[in-house]
Amino acid sequence: MTRNEKAEIISNLEAEFKTSDAIVVCDYKGLSVKKLEALRNSARELNVKVQVVKNTLANIALNNCGKSGMELKDTNIFVWGEDQLAVTKVVAKFEESNNELFKIKTAHIDGEVASVSKVVALSKMPSRDELIAMLLQVWNAPIQNFTIGLNALREKKEQTA
């Protein structure tokens, strides 16, 4: 790889990492190409990006955009995106199904280095749309119960009449 190619990769990664709210680094050693493609496809559906990058190039890009502090060793695959929950859900779900070959190593979330346990905890949280649905269900329940009660009262009065 020439110096110009490396510089281009670094600048592309910098631009991507600056706009991302979550960057997760995982070990993928021994994972088949078919499974890597499955990861990329599931990530693409949620607007999450997945790329294998050399550690030195990734480290330079991370340092240049102010997201340093992650220790990069061995083989790494980078998963990032603007939606923290989407990134963590993609990674955690894939780790569950490929536990022996795919491991979460470290992450950069909310401007700080995050542990594996934080990534897993974030992945279990409901998404924004799910939270809105829960809230609407809570708001709707009293009205629904009231109308059911009124309907039962009406039916009872019709039976007695």
Curated annotation (Swiss-Prot):
PANTHER family: 39S RIBOSOMAL PROTEIN L10, MITOCHONDRIAL
A GO cellular component entry from the record: large ribosomal subunit
Gene name, Swiss-Prot/TrEMBL: rplJ
PROSITE patterns per the UniProt record, alphabetical: RIBOSOMAL_L10 (PS01109)
Signal sequence residues: none
GO molecular function: large ribosomal subunit rRNA binding; structural constituent of ribosome
Entry's family note: Belongs to the universal ribosomal protein uL10 family.
Protein name stated in the entry: Large ribosomal subunit protein uL10
Task performed by this protein: Forms part of the ribosomal stalk, playing a central role in the interaction of the ribosome with GTP-bound translation factors.
Species name: Campylobacter fetus subsp. fetus (strain 82-40)
UniProt key word Metal-binding: no
Keywords recorded for this protein, A-Z: Ribonucleoprotein, Ribosomal protein, RNA-binding, rRNA-binding
One of the GO biological process terms: translation
Subunit architecture: Part of the ribosomal stalk of the 50S ribosomal subunit. The N-terminus interacts with L11 and the large rRNA to form the base of the stalk. The C-terminus forms an elongated spine to which L12 dimers bind in a sequential fashion forming a multimeric L10(L12)X complex.
Keyword Ribonucleoprotein among UniProt keywords: yes
Superkingdom in the source lineage: Bacteria
